[in-house]
């Protein structure tokens, strides 16, 4: 049976960054790997960040959001059937940062997928700089995306103090308890380490972490009602202006509650990936990009967002 791994994590936690390392590690073991990248909204920006995986033999398939649950499940099912028929040995699924994992497990239980796929690992990425307070819907997503994890990886540990790392662990435990989930993570199940320092032994342990069955009390809401994505195409703004103005979006209540900003900008003939949360902004060079900026959050005001960006 094809092994299928799930890499979860809330918006901006660092799933795509870890996914690149994880999929490349499996390819280095001689395993034929395919990544199924699922982004929130109608434009899949994260897929462009995985271009370099093709160089190590990893194939990438994508599903864009922006549709109802039934349509999304149908698209995912179709992709998984196609990948199984193409002979991949391992499929790594990265859902969006706003994702009900029950939807994924429901798809895996359907015929013929239940005969072709076996759940391998569930890995949850949690930001070491996780905000102290989230909305009830965001708290539920944090808990439900982590409950089945065989291993939790704290991201951005190199930027966090020991107190912040402990605070992220406590926050996760609190979110799980609020959802009436019995899942508790022991010290050996949480890896708090700069990813640049991950060893081959670390990767082998992560790749064998498995999963734990757990359940959370369901919080019923429509992801696309609770969370929104706003797209800006061909803004024509410089990298310097975007880097200066994007951080202000997170503190401006008139913009709504901004959770993440991501996209691309060209500067001097070089494309850069912009990725921002309330904890900070990064700009990393990439081979190719497109003039798009996506803001994800709650109660967003597009006109106000654009006004702030163009200041």
Regions found by a protein language model. Give the residues of each.
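A general structural signal for short secondary-structure boundary/capping elements
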Residues: 80-84, 108, 137-140, 275-280, ...
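Conserved C-terminal guanine-recognition region of P-loop GTPase G domains, centered on the G4
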Residues: 83, 98-184
């Amino acid at each position: 049976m094809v092994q299928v791994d799930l890499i979860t994590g809330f918006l901006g936690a660092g799933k795509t960054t870890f996914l690149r390392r994880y999929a490349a590690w499996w390819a280095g073991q001689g395993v034929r790997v395919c990544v199924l990248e699922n982004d929130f909204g109608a434009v899949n920006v994260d897929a462009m960040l995985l271009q370099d995986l093709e160089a190590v033999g990893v194939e990438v398939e994508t599903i864009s959001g922006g549709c109802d649950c039934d349509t999304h499940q149908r698209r995912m099912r179709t992709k998984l059937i196609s990948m199984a028929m193409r002979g991949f040995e391992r499929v790594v699924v990265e859902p969006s940062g706003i994702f009900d994992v029950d939807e994924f497990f429901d798809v895996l239980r359907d015929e013929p997928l239940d005969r072709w796929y076996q759940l391998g690992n569930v890995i949850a990425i949690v930001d070491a700089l996780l905000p102290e307070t989230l909305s009830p819907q965001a708290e539920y997503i944090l808990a439900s995306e982590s409950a089945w994890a065989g291993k939790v990886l704290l991201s951005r540990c190199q930027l966090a103090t020991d107190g912040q790392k402990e605070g992220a662990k406590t926050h996760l435990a609190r979110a799980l308890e609020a959802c009436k989930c019995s899942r508790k993570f022991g010290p050996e199940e949480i890896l708090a380490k700069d990813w640049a320092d991950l060893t081959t032994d670390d990767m082998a342990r992560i790749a064998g972490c498995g999963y734990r069955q757990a359940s959370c009390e369901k919080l019923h809401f429509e992801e696309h009602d609770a969370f929104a994505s706003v797209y800006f195409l061909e803004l024509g703004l410089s990298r310097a202006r975007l880097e200066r103005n994007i951080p202000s979006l997170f503190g401006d209540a008139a913009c709504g509650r901004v959770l993440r900003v991501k996209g691309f900008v060209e500067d001097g003939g070089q494309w850069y990936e912009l990725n921002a949360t309330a904890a900070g902004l990064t700009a990393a060079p990439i081979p190719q990009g497109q003039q798009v900026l996506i803001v994800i959050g709650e109660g967003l005001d597009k006109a106000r967002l654009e006004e702030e960006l163009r200041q």
